[in-house]
């Protein structure tokens, strides 16, 4: 019988202690003891006290291989953190305590022991591959355990375990690299990087490569920490360079894509040429490194100025011919018509900075065909002349810079007397402050490179652009057509009278020209205002979708922009296929033309997309919880979902009139009476109802007499109601359930720094729940909402606690009494009652929290009084 079977079948403490003693005495036989103990902890855990968990298990951990223990903990943490697993939080916290013990004692030594592995030992190589994968996955799996936490203290302890693991991981990698450096120095001879003469560095390289994005601190990841440590090393000799080659330039078993991501991240986080030179020192560009520095970084990313300088300097330092190729490719792409039309402003600035810095580096190089580059750039200038001023300004400047180089090269090769201009002249698009700053930056890059003392910050360009007004018409006043016609009216009449006889060649006088009154009516335009060109609004959603990309003609853009909401509300053919793309495009749409009521219209379009296509809400929720999104954008997206739910759950005005008319014809109660009886349920006596007191006495008497003398057919049956479909209830699986995001894994931050976002999610989910009304799905929706909000009732965040109270209040208010009694048993209701009392007596509770709790407690009390009056005799009501 294996160890796990023995642990599962153990029914007495003595048998269990004997098993632990056998494992401790013969660790080689039970080399998988950690995995067996973790998998069967929910079976034998009931026989051990909290202190025995430590006294009985920790001696076993000391006898086991720490490398295998780390791998086993990584596997078992995945199982115990899921909801379907019956493991209690006591078992989870115990397992985390064991992990913490092993990490503090043996993680550093386990990483260092990987240096002694021989590549010919297949089993050892496979073991340490699994170990590297476990080290990169454990922080995320520890975060998943927060889903089973019962209080804020538990979450803090889980974060402490994760922090201890990260710190020991960094220390272990650094110590292993120091030991490897000493081994390389003493190894003789060191014939190959992975040979028997030197240490085995693949495990360290795999940990750094796969765990490069592990957050060590709030700002820096694992790779950033390692780069800073490498940059601080003294006596960086050839042995260190060999190790850097093994870590950064040799691909691991994880594949080329991971290696490519590692190199890309390395360039993006490098702060200087010296640090990058320590990490990557190459004599040629081949394979993955060539693709990263020649394609991915320069043409698939928008880089900061410092990163552009580091990248180009690296290519220039490695091989000058590749830098020339990079310049030619940049000019070719920049001159392409399709690129010019689709490139945003940030991408345009990025590629212009690259071209100008490359021209700065090669300003004295004669091996470049400057004339060919100049001729290619002419296409880029022509295609930018009808675009925004920044594009025109960049095109003219790049063309002038290449023209200067071509002229200088031509004068040297052909002996021409033509001299290039010493400085580039400002063009007419430099009149604005933004244009001046951009011109100064381009001039500085071309003349001095990326010198921080001379280059203007691009952030300053964006800030200044928002401050500058768009009215640049000047003080000169132009007469409109109507004014010009009025001023010339008298002179034209006098001239016609004086020359009347000269205008006739057949002895007949021409009559005076009379201007019609309709032609005298003109609209006086404001100073600087241009007459608007009318464009027919698009009739198809696909055409409107494409017209939103218009960057030159504002009338085309506005024709689609202001008409697309009407198109969406008609549910056109083809809209389901492009709804999600349209939502994303609208979300990131920029007001390039200064369109009035731009933000309000964007909000209307986004809400219409969700209303007519609720299937996109799961994608919107994924966008909300995605890392890197600003809190304002997340709140904006939640606002869209909330407004769409209001529109889908509300009754249409025309439909409401139709329903009321039908109910009046069939003699049933009107909609207003139904709502009145539903809302005002606190008055047992009809005369005490304040709404009834507003009706005059004579009107009530007349209504009573008419009702007594009116014959109705089928009065014993409930009057039929006109069918009103709640679209929100039908779309609950798209509008409600995706909002219940499980705070685990990548979303574990919802329990910490993003707890405000979790509160907003619960609030919006409860509002959607209320808008769905009493529908067939109300059973499951009520249970899901309560289950989702219950674990956060005692959170440290006041907003999150208030959101949980509101969710419970909405459920108790919306659910009919008999249905609520069926879904929630008496112990659950008593628990709610006690929770409400604890909130009211808590001094740290906010006033809003107490107000909502009073309403919630009143609702629970009324339900107990009606359905379980005996329970209240034992409660302090």
Swiss-Prot record:
What is its subcellular localisation? Nucleus; Chromosome, Telomere
Keyword hit for Hydrolase = no
According to its UniProt entry, the protein's GO biological process terms are:
'de novo' cotranslational protein folding; determination of adult lifespan; DNA damage checkpoint signaling; response to UV; response to X-ray; telomere maintenance
Instruction: Give an example GO molecular function.
Output: telomeric DNA binding
Region (Disordered), start-end ranges: 488-509
Cystine crosslinks: none
Instruction: Tell me the first and last residues of the signal peptide.
Output: none
Keyword terms, alphabetized: Chromosome, DNA-binding, Nucleus, Telomere
Task: Give Gene Ontology CC terms.
Answer: chromosome, telomeric region; cytoplasm; cytosol; nucleus
Q: Which spans does this entry mark as compositional bias, Polar residues?
A: 488-501
Family, per the entry?
Answer: Belongs to the TEL2 family.
Q: What does this protein do?
A: DNA damage checkpoint protein required for DNA damage-induced cell cycle arrest and apoptosis, thereby playing a role in genome stability. Regulator of telomere length.
Q: Mind telling me what this protein is named?
A: Telomere length regulation protein clk-2
Annotated source species: Caenorhabditis elegans
